[in-house]
């Protein structure tokens, strides 16, 4: 999650955000793991950046999480629609960009049927072991306006 106080603490005078102190206490574990999974319980909906109750974190936060070694993002959660369908779509766009440049993967939400089929379940192979990851949520605080982008629900 990314609360208002965290956003303010990370803000720099030039308008950027720096999260370099995040995860320092667990970095040695991240560095020595083959698979690091993060529950991304916020959107990357763009400005204005907000905390509770409708989360929208700076894009730099997702980049920092990736740089720390997280390589799987779980995206289905009650906050994924905090900025409605447009915010969720922008979040997926950022995750796709990270997936192309940094070999991260995500599951739990999808922009279309093809993406849904590729990520649900998310199948990964690490050291010759095949791993299936399924991510779903009980619901969202603000429902999606249409069938796509799709959210995996527990009832599905």
Language-model features: locations:
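Acidic, metal/ion-coordinating pockets
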Residues: 1-156
């Amino acid at each position: 999650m990314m609360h208002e106080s965290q956003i303010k603490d990370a803000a720099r005078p030039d308008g950027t955000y720096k999260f370099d102190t995040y995860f320092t206490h667990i970095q040695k574990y991240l560095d020595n793991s083959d698979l690091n999974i993060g529950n991304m319980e916020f959107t990357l909906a763009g400005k204005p950046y907000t905390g509770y109750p409708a989360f929208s974190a700076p894009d730099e936060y997702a980049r920092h999480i990736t740089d720390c070694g997280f390589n799987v993002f779980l995206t289905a959660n009650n906050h994924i629609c905090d900025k409605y369908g447009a915010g969720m779509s922008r979040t997926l766009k950022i995750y796709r960009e990270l997936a192309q440049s940094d070999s991260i993967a995500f599951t739990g939400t999808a922009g279309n049927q093809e993406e849904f089929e590729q990520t649900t379940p998310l199948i990964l192979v690490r050291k010759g072991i095949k791993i299936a990851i399924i991510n779903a949520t009980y619901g969202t605080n603000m429902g999606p306006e249409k069938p796509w982008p799709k959210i995996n629900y527990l009832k599905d």
